């Protein structure tokens, strides 16, 4: 369960090119937004003064192809699975409004991970062990094709325990009704050293070599954060193993742990309960510090423990699933297409009063295929192929050269609903600026200090999206290339500081680094999906992913927006291929299996 309450505190154009006059070395104050001569200047040191929103917070911020219910609050994905021809998405849902509270398990089904039918809640708060909330959990498919939900419930004193539910009728293709086990809760935090209010979010179960089921639960043990390990013969009666799957003494409570097997360089998924191929690694993910982090290592069967390849004490250096507004992710093995899929919760970053006016809050990111890179060091992610079924009106350009200060407008696509794929080829790598390893501790800070208005040797180059006519509003997604002693480091940023003129918004600069062998690859790829208030960007083939929430006034006012490719580095950047599509609207919880969705 994500502790959601913590988040509530709250042109002069020549053809398609724009001249280098758009890139003064550093502009501020009255020059921001224009130079007095009709030219648009967007790389400002200081954003224009906020303006009040439209009389009503526009429904235009509702996404067109992301998963979200028609109304009210949602947070964590819970128990995704593929079963009997349908994908099931359960999620944390408030039946009563667009604020956190009264949490039940929402439920939707799909055949393609794009279009969803909303159903009645699978689990509601109606027993003593879950009266405070039906919190996050997982689904495990038992032998014989028997799905079982295991989830965290809170009692009247907010003590947490794990509960189980089974489908009432497995022949129902939608699995609408679920029956809770009579002996719930099946797992309590009764052991010495455990914290009864920090014990939640059980993982999908897996079978060990001894034939026993295993499961991890996020918790605190003797003040340490841990993925606690449990065993069972029948999935109903559980015994705590005398050591955790893994623990750490320097981090906050681990929420929403996830544990799965991956094979280096192979994007096929692995079922953790099946035979794991030789050479496979394991990933342990935890939601902590308001972000999702992970480690790569091995599952030591003799010790029944996860062993990281590299033990990093400073959790600021732990690997990240996503560097933006992304939390409480959940993965599952998709037996339909033999892949592992992950998605996360992206919260709103406007104000709670905006959410009340909108009548909804929260969405899930586009489902992503997730696998291990060839070098076995990091996870890669890419939107599932099904999302491409929404593409229409393809625009394609080849052989674009971007010199310092150039903007190239990507026209004839819907700038509010678009999928853009672009590759940047570097003519020279000699101009890369030196890399400072201390930047790894806070890449967001470095993105803020070295924004797109600050020229570098190689970069910044990337995309300007959701840009208003006069550039007063725009979001930048871009790269900078640095030279370390024996390798190149690429910084990817998603800078929202000038994304909107509306007040009371979070407008940070997100960022993450990745290693890149520029001498071999020479090209850095970027894919950005724009869906009104949600932007998901994938850099370097999925090495860094950044989810952003943006609320430009131009969208609320039903105005016009623009997309540009740009370069503000000294080195020329070539774009061998640029493709963009308008994205059609998906049918997300519009077809109702239940009147309240």
UniProtKB/Swiss-Prot annotation:
Single GO biological process annotation from the record: carbohydrate metabolic process
Pfam families named among the record's database cross-references: Glyco_hydro_32C, Glyco_hydro_32N
GO-annotated molecular function: fructan beta-(2,1)-fructosidase activity; hydrolase activity
Reaction catalysed by this enzyme: Hydrolysis of terminal, non-reducing (2->1)-linked beta-D-fructofuranose residues in fructans
Source species: Triticum aestivum (Wheat)
Signal sequence, start to end: 1-20
Family note: Belongs to the glycosyl hydrolase 32 family.
Protein name: Fructan 1-exohydrolase w1
Gene expressing this chain: 1-FEHw1
Higher taxonomy: Eukaryota, Viridiplantae, Streptophyta, Embryophyta, Tracheophyta
Active-site residues from the entry: 76
Activity at various pH: Optimum pH is 4.5-5.5. Inactive above pH 7.5.
EC assignment: 3.2.1.153
Record's function text: Hydrolyzes inulin-type beta-(2,1)-fructans and beta-(2,1)-linkages in branched fructans. Has low activity against beta-(2,6)-linked fructans. May play a role as a beta-(2,1)-trimmer during graminan biosynthesis.
Activity regulation note: Inhibited by sucrose.
Temperature dependence: Optimum temperature is 30-40 degrees Celsius.
Keywords for this protein: Disulfide bond, Glycoprotein, Glycosidase, Hydrolase, Signal
Residue positions with a glycan: 169, 237, 249, 568
Stored Gene3D superfamilies: Exo-inulinase, domain 1, Glycosyl hydrolase domain, family 43
